[in-house]
A protein has these predicted regions:
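Flexible "arm" and connector segments at domain edges
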Residues: 1-105
């Protein structure tokens, strides 16, 4: 891996592979499905004590594709989503509310 993509470069390249209709439904359900596949690998790790890192990495790539396409469908760049998330987490850290639950903490 010599050439590393930025989030936005990845998103633009991934958009060229998107061939679906009903964008929000397809990408939302696809994201849930791929996240479930990651969870399945973790479940098998708990059961068997072995984790196939490459298989999980490939599934994370699928998760990333769906996140990128969902962001595009909502007219956001991945870098904007990343910045919004870091702003939220930074605010929680400043307020001492990283732990706990709920979006508005």
């Amino acid at each position: 891996m010599t050439n590393k993509l930025t989030l936005d470069q990845y998103q633009k390249a991934a958009e060229k592979t998107a061939i679906y209709t009903d964008a929000l439904v397809y990408t939302g359900l696809g994201l849930a499905g791929e996240a479930g596949e990651v969870a399945d690998h973790i479940k098998k790790f708990l059961r068997d004590g072995e984790l196939n890192h490459e298989a999980v990495a490939k599934e994370l790539g699928d998760v990333l594709w769906y996140v990128a396409m969902l962001a595009s469908d909502l007219e956001y760049d991945l870098s904007e989503i990343a910045q919004m998330n870091m702003d939220k987490l930074s605010g929680r850290h400043t307020r001492g509310t990283i732990g706990g639950s709920g979006d508005e903490r």
